[in-house]
Amino acid sequence: GVSEGFPFDETTLVFKVMGKIFCIADLEGNTGIALKNTPEKIMEMREEWPCITPASHLSHIHWNNIGDTFTIPATLLKSWIDDSYHIVVKGLTRKLQEELKNMPYSSNEQIE
């Protein structure tokens, strides 16, 4: 269900679930990571954290860029990544959701 790759360039790691992007990470550390969320949560995150801005080249309504991930507590960052994953899964077709649900996972691949 989850894959990772470099579809844009050699320093931008993209995570997908069933072919749909849920996380984009700049491995050089220049722009941080981009995550999807609900429009309400997007605005709340931007108001609370100065390092969070609208994501470049993505819908500003649904995507945030977290510029300095080191200022965010690790548990909160993990929670936002999980939220992004689940929002994308919720937007999948029923058929793809069913395929994902029925996929076997090894212990190190499972996403909670």
Describe the role of every protein-language-model region.
Residues G1-E112:
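Charge-dense, helix-prone N-terminal extensions
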